[in-house]
Amino acid sequence: MDCSGYVRTVLLQHDMIIPRDASQQAVTGQRIEIAKDFSNLQPGDLVFFGRVADGKERVGHVAFYLGNKEFIHCLGLVERSSFDPTAPNYDAYNTGRMLFAARVLPYINKEKGLNTTDQNPYYQANFE
């Protein structure tokens, strides 16, 4: 399973539907520029990683923020990592390519592409 599939699966287990790819997930909810101390993030926020090319952000990875500078993500295996350089699970690679975060949970059923199954036309048509 890849990162965006992991995010999608976890949310679907809680009856929430989110777009399929990390780049699509990155344009949902409220964008958050991450504070140096991570104080403006909340557990459940999505953190996006990638690179800036030609002045444009290229999202290539997504994770759930857990709090206390930790995040959980998947690249084949689910892994709990940290942005804190003093932590044993510090992830220097992903810390170096962190772009921004997004708060999506308050926007479920309020924004196109973020639904619960009972509000999604596909699920209504095929599973009732």
Please report, for each region that a protein language model flagged, where it lies by residue.
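Acidic helix/loop microenvironments that form the catalytic cleft of cell-wall polysaccharide enzymes
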Residues: 1-5, 49, 65
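Catalytic cysteine-centered active-site loop
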Residues: 1-42
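Aromatic- and glycine-rich peptidoglycan recognition patches
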Residues: 34-35, 59-128
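Generic structural signal for buried aliphatic residues
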Residues: 44-47
